[in-house]
Amino acid sequence: MKPKLILIGGGGHCKSCIDVIEQENKFLIAGIVDTNRSICDLLGYPWLGHDDDLANLKLSYDYALITIGQIKSPAIRVRLFNYAKSLGFKLPVIISPRAYVSKHAKLGNGTIVMHDALINAEAIVGENCIINTKSLIEHDAVIENNCHISTGAIINGGAIVKQGSFVGSNAVTKESVKTNEKDFIKAGSLFKGYANE
């Protein structure tokens, strides 16, 4: 029997995560944890409780995924990830069957790779990251923990996206450049960054 997975955070990103989890077909979604009870029955899945209920939910469930989005700040995702981890939840890597991840790439716990994303050879993606729909992580690129690479963004070879950063839709980083921590790269922009030493 497939293990049950709880989703932490309702809303638009959660809907996209549900679709990927259903398509991957490795977990059964038990329900959603959110501070807003009105999200009950999101795409047919029940509301399980508030963030404060996670300790009790751990008695029944082993797996959790952070499904709240990230644009301006990673703070909420980081807090929830660390809290779930401290309670002993396992935070799996979720990969859409429509994505391509090289067998030579590495992905950290709690990261989700959405439909039609591509992660190439020897790329490294940290924990609790969103690799969103149609994004490209090229060879030898590094995406540190708690980053969101948004829809259609391109991280070229050898680039480093520092922890907590957001790269907007259709933004492009040049090869072998480095962002700052918690950087915000605007949608559609070309990021020239600083050359790696």
Predicted regions and their residues:
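Short alpha-helical
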Residues: G12-H13, K72-A75, K106
